[in-house]
């Protein structure tokens, strides 16, 4: 059996006339010019770097920080209101679920849903957890860490999502 080996420089996901990143997770965000230029976008795909204007958090990717004093989850949920979000803690996990029904936008009808689950460190004080949504759509889940002599309770409970009027200023590491 003959197998054709192509250098990654010449690989194209759907052929030379289709952008290779149309099906990324940026649904409803629109396209940039380089998304529609197949020779620029798919020809250099293994070495391609996204525009500097799109940050990691713009892509819906969460950021988890755990330092000596607290545990923090930052998640971009700009397409959801606090009523669309459910945050609950069960045992050693925090579950964040977002869903909004089909609604009309500039391009037609769209519905979104996500479900994220994170393991909480064993020394997080589950009775003091908080969750807030900034004006720019950044969900911040915080939990202070307890001293080693104290015992953390492990039961299921919902964490209310409060709305902040100011944009998120992500705490520095």
Swiss-Prot record:
The modification N6-acetyllysine is found at residue 99. The modification Phosphoserine is found at residues 45, 122. Residues 1-63 are annotated as: Required for complex formation with BFSP1 and BFSP2. GO terms for molecular function: metal ion binding; structural constituent of eye lens; unfolded protein binding. The modification N-acetylmethionine is found at residue 1. SUPFAM superfamilies: HSP20-like chaperones (SSF49764). The keyword Nucleus applies. Residues 52-162 form the sHSP domain. Keywords: Acetylation, Chaperone, Cytoplasm, Disulfide bond, Eye lens protein, Glycoprotein, Metal-binding, Methylation, Nucleus, Phosphoprotein, Zinc. It holds the Pfam family HSP20. InterPro entries: A-crystallin/Hsp20_dom, Alpha-crystallin/HSP_16, Alpha-crystallin/sHSP_animal, Alpha-crystallin_N, HSP20-like_chaperone. Glycans are attached at residue 162. Residues 149-173 are annotated as: Disordered. The modification Deamidated glutamine is found at residues 6, 50, 90, 147. The modification Deamidated asparagine is found at residues 101, 123. One of its GO terms (cellular component) is cytoplasm. Disulfide bonds join 131-142. Contributes to the transparency and refractive index of the lens. In its oxidized form (absence of intramolecular disulfide bond), acts as a chaperone, preventing aggregation of various proteins under a wide range of stress conditions. Required for the correct formation of lens intermediate filaments as part of a complex composed of BFSP1, BFSP2 and CRYAA. Belongs to the small heat shock protein (HSP20) family. This is Alpha-crystallin A chain. The lineage of its organism: Eukaryota, Metazoa, Chordata, Craniata, Vertebrata.
């Amino acid at each position: 059996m003959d197998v054709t080996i192509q250098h990654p420089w010449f690989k194209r996901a759907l052929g030379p006339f289709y952008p290779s990143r149309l099906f990324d997770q940026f649904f409803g965000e629109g396209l940039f010019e380089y998304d529609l230029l197949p020779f620029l976008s798919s020809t250099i795909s293994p070495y391609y770097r996204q525009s500097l204007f799109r940050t990691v958090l713009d892509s819906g990717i969460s950021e988890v920080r755990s330092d000596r004093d607290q545990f923090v989850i930052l998640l971009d949920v700009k397409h959801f209101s606090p009523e669309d979000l459910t945050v609950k803690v069960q045992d050693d996990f925090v579950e964040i679920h977002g869903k909004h029904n089909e609604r009309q936008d500039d391009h037609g009808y769209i519905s979104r849903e996500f479900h994220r689950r994170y393991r909480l460190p064993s020394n997080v004080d589950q009775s003091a957890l908080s969750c807030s949504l900034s004006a720019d759509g950044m969900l911040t889940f915080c939990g202070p860490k307890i001293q080693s002599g104290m015992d953390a309770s492990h039961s299921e409970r919902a964490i209310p999502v409060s709305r902040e009027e100011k944009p998120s200023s992500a705490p520095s590491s």
